[in-house]
Every structure is written in structure tokens, then in C-alpha cells.
Amino acid sequence: MLGDSLSAEYGLKRGSGWVALLEKKLQAEKLPVTVVNASISGDTTAGGRSRLAGLLTQHRPTHVIIELGANDALRGLPLQLTEDNLNQMTQAAQKSGAKVLLIGMQMPPNYGKDYGARFTALYAAVAKINKAALVPFLLKGIADAPGNAADSTRLFQADRIHPKEEAHPLMLANVWPELKKILK
């Protein structure tokens, strides 16, 4: 698991984030999978790319989940750079023999409609080019909760960026169907 604060339990008690919940689900399903959470709060695709080779050598994973890119966008980094880094990470993981699940994100509307649409689309493009599995939006049903503005912020910490503990089961529910397909 290569991700940022959304996967590194930022602001949560240890063992309550969606990756820890995934590990418990895998155990309950009696799937012989070991989860290595190499997520770092604040990480970008460049940071993930620079760490990936060492992680692949050290752990020799059969599956790699990549949840990166949100911090690139929040920092206003060029979308082509983000896409290139995601492509390189996906290809490196696949070259090592791992199946890849790419987890997409979306940007708030204040980044502009065009930027947001292009950012969202780059995940689908990377997944398609590399024939990788894709979860289009990790925060589906959380950041885009139905109803009024209060509904869409109630599942977030005070910073309105990081989900509260009660949102993490929903995040796992967004990931599990696609992950289960590639675990077979």
C-alpha cells in the first residue's frame, strides 16, 4: 500500500484507518495476504515513485495499491508530472510481477472545473494504458455525500481534508470490490 495521509491514518487512532480495516477483512476472508502500509502523510507521486523500487525489492509484493496524487494537485503541480509518476509506478510494480490497483481522487470545485476534470481523468488514463484495476474515487459517498453542505463535511476532521474514523469503513467499501477482483 503506497499512499498519502488518507491511507496513513492521519488524525486517527492507530488501527482505525481503511488500510487497517482492509487487513482485518482479508484475515476474516481467510485470504493469505500480508498488508504492508508504506503510506506517508503529505506524500506526492514523486515521493512514492522515489520509494517504490526499494519497497518492491524489500517486500516483493504480489499486489500493489497506489493511492497518491491528491497532494500533487493540492500543491498545484503539473498534471502531466502526476500522470507520468503514476504511470512509472504502475509499470514498475507490474514489471516486478505485482498486480496494481490504482485509487483515484477528485479535487474540490475551487480548483476550477477544467483542472478538476483533467485531474480525475488522469487516473482512468493511467489504469487503461497499463491495464491496471481502478477505484475512480476513494472518497465516493464521503466527499460527495448527498444532501446539503453539512452532509458533505460531517465525515471530515476539522481541516475538512482528512476523513474522520467513521468514514474509513466507507473508504474500504469503495476499494474492496476492485481489490477483490485482482486478488483471485
Language model regions located:
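Alpha-helical cap/lid subdomain in secreted, periplasmic
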Residues: 31, 49-184
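Serine-esterase "nucleophile elbow" of acetyl-processing enzymes
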Residues: 1-41, 51-60
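Acidic/histidine-rich helix-loop elements
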Residues: 11, 36-45, 73-77, 160
